Amino acid sequence: MRERKETAMSDKEKKGAGAGAQVAPAMGPPVLINKEDIPAVLPILPLRNSVFFPGGVLPLAVGRQKTIALIKDAVRDEQVIGVVTQRRAEEEDPGAADLYTVGTVARVVKLLKMGEDNYSLVVQGLARFKVLELVQESPYLKARIEAVEDRSVVDDVEVEALAINLKKLAREVIELMPELPAAATELVESITHPGHLADLIAANVDVPIEEKQQVLETVELKARMKLVLELLNRKREILKLSNKIDSAVKGEMSKTQREYYLRQQLKAIKEELGELGEEEEELDELQERLKKAGLPPEVEKVAQKELNRLKSIPTASSEYTVARTYLDWIADLPWTKRTDDNLDIENARQILDTDHYGLDKIKKRILEYLAVRKLKNDMRGPILCFVGPPGVGKTSLGQSIARATGRKFVRLSLGGVRDEAEIRGHRRTYVGALPGRIIQSMKKAATVNPVMMLDEIDKLGADFRGDPSAALLEVLDPEQNHAFSDHYLDLSYDLSKVMFIGTANLLDPIPGPLKDRMEILELPGYTFEEKVHIAQNHLIPKQLREHGLSADAIAISEKALIKIIMAYTREAGVRNLERRIADVCRAIAVEVASGKIGASAKRSIEEADVLEILGPEKFYNETAERTEIAGVATGLAWTAAGGDILFIEATKMPGKGALTLTGQLGDVMKESAQAALSYLRSKSDSLGIPVNFLEKTDLHIHFPAGAIPKDGPSAGVTILTALVSLLTGIRVRSDVAMTGEVTLRGLVLPVGGIKEKVLAAHRAGIKRIIIPARNEKDLLDVPEQARKELEFVFAAHMDEVLQAALEENPVGRKPPAAPEPEGEKKPGATPTPPAKKPDEIRV
């Protein structure tokens, strides 16, 4: 426990005397002890934050076990002790190196027990001594000492002059300190021994411990008095200047300034007493952090102004917490710290290839950036946006880019964000205000040039609180983001060195201005072969590690893997594929844990094992079954998951020419169906369909998966093909899928999402795909492996579509002859039975 020092003065005399204040017990010379009465070995009492002089009286509170044992022995044996100041006050168990070499012989004149392990005592200084060596460390310190005797002539003229000057200076200092009582002057005047006078003044003047110790170590009287004169003179000048400043400031001091002044005085007193509070230490630490943060000049000016204001605010005030938190944010943000880019192109290529299979266009763009960055050091960070279905590796690709460039990676999820303040932050006037997510992410990154991923940027919302996508315009604008302004900081922050990467499943929901600021890079769905490669080289090893299985524990055959991909997943990415592989790993883990197979045994997974572990197949190729009757065609649709096949069913029934559409269709798709029907009616004669087929017939077109909304013009050719198949009785080929917009003249117009639609058809086992002729160029984006396994028909007119899609070309067929009315039959003619109509087939 730390010893606590007080003074031996009365309450009035204590005020303003400072730490470790000591007074003489009498007016005459100090209490002396004969040199021969001082033992050669003394118990040593270490003293903190004070220097004890001969002739002084000092009360102490002790609690350390070593000190208590020392005091008890000294009182019992009526022996003197040695009081020596510690070099470092925080040292709890000082040794020889932690103590000064000159101390004061003292006698314990009073001892009181204050508690179980606390004592209060009063010691009286007798003489100086010098520590020669420590001879004992337990149970307390003992040292071999040498008494130091001052043999100076007291009645020397120079000594007398020095004493007069000392008393004069002491009176001036006391007058400059009105808080001291008048008795202080009387005490100084009453002391006649010059050595005692010098020691008393040195003990009570407010100077550093090191300078007081220097006075104690100065044995020769004249030198000691001159040293004290120098200390006292410096103290007088400081007090004069302080009083002058006080007089100038107090005249215009407001309540806040007065409070600041008092707190500064309190801080100085606490420092002198060794009781500096945590708040002051924290503020000093905060100031040091701000110095090391490398702040720009304008930011440093604001921070210093706020810090000065903080020092004048009471710690109990809520404003103190607000200002302190604000400065913490400024100190914690990276202003100049950056990570060096790894510009090794081959190393970056190797990292990207190791982490991701395929995605050549994305990898090429990243390597281009690194190449330009290598040639031009001050290049701004690119702003990319990866658009693709779930599970194709958009987020993990951002992590790989950070690893390849050697930068920090931070991810900012924007899904569901509707408040503009989430991006820009709240102003400090609000309770609990914080910076926006951009600044929070920069603090987390701790560098000015991280890779920052803006995940799910297409799922930003907007409401009465503002539009977050509009706030992102400044963030993602290379011409503005060097001075991004967060509402909380209210300072310019440079984001120009950040590499921003956005991710989205859909491009359409992203506002135009925001889309314009980003370089769009589309990630296609994986082909069948790519999924097999990814599973074998990435997913299976990863799941084996996560399930505690050795690399040789499972051998999933390629046939089994194909079965999992074809029968249990139907996706553009590989997320569900990874889940199914995890299911297999868990099944093997159960067998290993239950002892059915050895931990080192290798388990082979075949197709039959897949069925046993994963259960019934969830997906199967149904195009042949669905299109085995006339009136059903297979279309291609674009979805957020990357693309899918879409069956369109048409049927007819007796009626008056009504057209019914079902399947949660949007207006555009309904209009496409109406346009297809109009074209069919205009060309019915050339397709072998009766001209008046709608007079007594109703048509119903249905799009299965009725719970899912559908819209868009690209189903036009599929609707028309299904209607032609229905009305002619010619089936659509089961291995054909199609997409395209149809006009009233039968032209096939280009549509979007070709890459996703082609990959969806490839996954579903389609062999022939009919697409608009003007979409031929879009096949360059389709992976080469998929292009090789598919047959493409590029159609510019519906005649080409029908010729490629139907099992028999209906173009040019003649419609069946209409039967003669019964009333016009010739007498005696034999009635001919009507031929079987092809449109009698029902779905």
UniProtKB/Swiss-Prot annotation:
First-listed, main subcellular location of the protein, grouped into a coarse class: cytoplasm
Domain spans labelled Lon N-terminal: 42-236
Classification of source organism: Bacteria, Pseudomonadati, Myxococcota, Myxococcia, Myxococcales
Positions of the UniProt region annotated as Disordered: 1-22, 805-843
Protein name: Lon protease
Catalytic activity annotation: Hydrolysis of proteins in presence of ATP
InterPro entries: AAA+_ATPase (IPR003593), ATPase_AAA_core (IPR003959), Lon_bac (IPR027543), Lon_bac/euk-typ (IPR004815), Lon_lid (IPR054594), Lon_proteolytic (IPR008269), Lon_Prtase (IPR027065), Lon_prtase_N (IPR003111)
EC number, UniProt record: 3.4.21.53
Location of this chain's protein in the cell: Cytoplasm
